[in-house]
Amino acid sequence: MEHNNNPGTPQMSSEFPASTTQTSSSAAAYDNSSHFEKEQSLMRWEQDLKLRERALANNQSAADITGPHVVVPAPATAHPRQANFPSSYPMIRLNLEEDIAIREYRQIVKFGIFVFLWEAAALVYNWVVSIGTIVYSAVDNFFLALFYMIVGVPTLYFLTRKLYRAASVPERARKSYAYLMALLGVVLFNIIFFVGFKRSGMNGLIWVISLFHNDHNAVGAMATVSLFFWFVGVFLTIALFIMYLRLNNTKRQRGEIQNAGFREYIKSR
């Protein structure tokens, strides 16, 4: 049976059915339309993003020009506090009310300053007594006492400054307990000077007995005053150690400061 093709009608190949060809062309058209819509959406999103960035930049520049300038203060530790003592020629910082917030620690520092002045006076007077011993050919005693005074007074000063700084930040256990360990050395220092070995530059008990035994009564009387200085110094330094350690432990147990105990500090060394 013959198939007649009308003129003007497109001739379809028998290998590709009409339905398949129409479906493929429709899918291609849909894909092209989908890609076009995505591109348009991306372009709109990008344009919107640029507009927002431009508006944000304009607002920022306007705020910089017309808005208030806020100056953020630096931390307190960035700039050291100015010296204020003595007032005529300030060399050190001494302001208990501003630097030490806790009242009990201010009292400890005041007592520590008194102990420093007492110990410094004891060292100076110890050297004065040794001047009198030169008459009895105890020249070595004089130079040793001079050495103790030159080294001891600055050392005691720096220890007192350490107490001042530790009381300013009592929550830092390392500073507090480092001072207490150094203070134990000062206690031992006073005990040795109180004993006072002969010709050692320490005008204490043994040296006083020796002076009176050899009928050096005048110098012996001066050395007795030095002995009194060291006797009182022993109790002052022990009292300072106990007061500061007890205050630290009390504040720690109450939760007012957060630091480790003295035993934990010793174990960590």
Swiss-Prot record:
One of its GO terms (cellular component) is recycling endosome membrane. Its main location: membrane. Keywords: Membrane, Transmembrane, Transmembrane helix. Residues 18-29 have a biased composition (Low complexity). Residues 1-17 have a biased composition (Polar residues). PANTHER family: SECRETORY CARRIER-ASSOCIATED MEMBRANE PROTEIN (PTHR10687:SF2), SECRETORY CARRIER-ASSOCIATED MEMBRANE PROTEIN SCAMP (PTHR10687). This is Prespore protein Dd31. It comes from Dictyostelium discoideum (Social amoeba).
